[in-house]
């Protein structure tokens, strides 16, 4: 496992720095899995899960912090309502180019929360580049529980100590990370945000959709929507699990991901 690096990135006339880390890079003949973090996530917040998964799958891995997170360049402007669509179509391809990922390499995407939505959107926009997607706790539309969870997170961040302190261990600019995500989702009108039409009839690879039954940010309706939109979807509801299955039930996540990965290699 290589050490994290800071990679320069040119995006829309701006020069940014992207924090990234390669896993098992020496396994050049094996497929590459891209890890896409949650809305308050970063490279370091994955902990050891990506390496464990890559070892189980015998694949290479690439983790990075999106701009606004971790040690990547802080956010300069508010996220627009369609920020995930923009990231899927422009930012993620630019990051992959900057990090030396060949455009003809078919990728396996593992996304959590915002990152799961991003993985689905990228797979829909560039189906020729994706061999399979794991969408863990994805967002396809906004539910009342989503808004309530965001409000509670804001209360905890502004009036408590533990959440701010926890995030400060992983983000160079904690306010940039928190408010970029929280402000966008709580902005008036965002409750109408929906990516179902972006995905409809555009996904071409197998999808594993995982959701904790106790997820405070979304219900099983999120992954059920994926199955309605795309026939080649395996649904997995995890009893007793919240919004972070990779931390709460990592063995189950790895087991289900192995099954999908084997299908994608067949």
Name each model-derived stretch:
Residues 23-74:
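Conserved HGGG/HGGXW glycine-rich cap/lid loop of the alpha/beta-hydrolase fold
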Residues 213-218, 243:
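Acidic catalytic loop of the alpha/beta-hydrolase fold
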Residues 239-266:
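Catalytic active-site module of serine/aspartate enzymes centered on a nucleophile-bearing elbow/loop
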Residues 63-107, 255:
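Active-site loop/oxyanion-hole signature of alpha/beta-hydrolase fold enzymes
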Residues 202-203, 209-211:
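Short beta-strand/loop motif that positions the catalytic acidic residue
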Residues 117-125, 130-161:
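Flexible "cap/lid" loop of the alpha/beta hydrolase fold
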Residues 182-199:
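Active-site nucleophile elbow and catalytic-triad environment of alpha/beta-hydrolase enzymes
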Residues 111-113:
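Conserved alpha/beta-hydrolase "nucleophile elbow" surrounding the catalytic nucleophile
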């Amino acid at each position: 496992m290589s050490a994290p690096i800071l990679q320069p990135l040119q995006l829309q006339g701006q020069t940014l720095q992207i924090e990234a880390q390669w896993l098992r890079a020496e396994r050049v003949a094996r497929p590459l899995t891209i890890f896409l973090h949650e809305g308050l996530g970063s490279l370091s917040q994955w902990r050891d899960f990506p390496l464990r998964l890559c070892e189980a799958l015998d694949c290479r891995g690439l983790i990075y912090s999106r701009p606004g997170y971790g040690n990547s360049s802080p956010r300069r402007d508010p996220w627009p309502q369609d920020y995930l669509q923009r990231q899927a179509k422009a930012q993620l391809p630019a990051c992959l180019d900057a990090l030396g990922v060949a455009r003809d390499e078919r990728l396996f995407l593992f996304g959590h929360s915002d990152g799961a939505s991003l993985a689905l959107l990228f797979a829909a926009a560039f189906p020729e580049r994706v061999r399979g997607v794991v969408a863990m706790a994805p967002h396809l539309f906004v539910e009342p529980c989503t808004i309530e969870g965001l409000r509670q997170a804001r209360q905890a961040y502004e009036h408590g100590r533990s959440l701010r302190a926890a995030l400060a261990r992983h983000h160079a600019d904690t306010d940039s990370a928190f408010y970029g995500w929280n402000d966008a989702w709580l902005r008036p009108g965002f409750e109408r945000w929906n990516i179902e039409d972006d995905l409809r009839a555009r996904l071409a690879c197998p999808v594993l959709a995982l959701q904790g039954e106790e997820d405070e940010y979304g219900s099983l309706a999120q992954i059920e929507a994926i199955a309605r939109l795309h026939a080649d979807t395996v649904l997995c509801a995890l009893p007793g699990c919240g919004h972070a299955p990779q931390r709460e039930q990592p063995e189950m996540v790895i087991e289900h991901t192995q099954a999908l990965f084997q299908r994608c290699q067949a």
